[in-house]
């Protein structure tokens, strides 16, 4: 498969296709990177960075809006996740990292994947406990992966999110999600009780 070179933005989070991510760009190397991406209408790669280094699989991102620019070159932007990729090699020729990557496609049709029994009910319960409302109805025609949408929406452990992003089969992703959501319920119940005790009625801080 053909390799392409893209800039890398290591972050302590996982970006999914179709997800919107606000970013504050302040480091000189990333100000340069974002400016070059905007000027050339090109994408960069968001990759999970942790104590063990960077992950092998990430998601390309496209700048959709520059919401604020500062005199010193800092900027607030919004990006949208596009496509998963796998790093083949990292290149250090510029102030920021680049990588030769191959784009990843699902091995099966995500839209036709079977939804595990109980998954939507557990998802709705988590959402109500955490945010005080039912989740929005999922549009499977415009957003291919229900698993990506759920994993993006809820405060799952970042390693769990990375596991979902790395899978190339929607049936596998959905099957993996169900125990993750069941494990989230106790945490969601604690946050719900804290919100009730504080008298809040808005979104919980996650």
Where are these regions (language model features)?
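N-terminal low-complexity, acidic/polar interaction/targeting segments
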Residues: 1-206
